[in-house]
Amino acid sequence: QVVETAPRLPDGSPFPTLYYLTCPRAASAIGTLEGGGLMAEMTKRLETDPELAAAYRAAHADYVAKRDAIDVLDGFPSAGGMPDRVKCLHALVGHALAAGPGVNPFGDEALALLPEWWRGGPCVPVAGKGAGKGADESADAAADPAQSNPH
């Protein structure tokens, strides 16, 4: 459901989104959360909850360290608004899926609010797989994304 991308485009320009969601159903559900005002509410909580703010700064440090291990983007912050605000839940959920539970508090929170998008089988058609056993196996394997590393 998430892929790790190169921090630079082929022309050398920065591409700060390290973790990119590949499932259109998940991306759509996240867009619904964004449209509902969740990001503004999360950003306000950063101002009043020092422990949450510290955890979010740690998520930012984790994100930047993983990106910089591939290619350093001097002067470019991490994605999603980290560490001072919440700007893109897609980036935060991608980070949460790739890093695992407990690393990105807002990514974890948004992920917990999503419907079970993986229950319907693969997010995109799989070549050679019909609606039969192959799709069921894919759905079973993805039934609990917290139990597997999705990238």
Residue ranges, per PLM feature:
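Preference for intrinsically disordered or flexible, low-complexity segments
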Residues: 1-136, 140, 144-145, 149-151
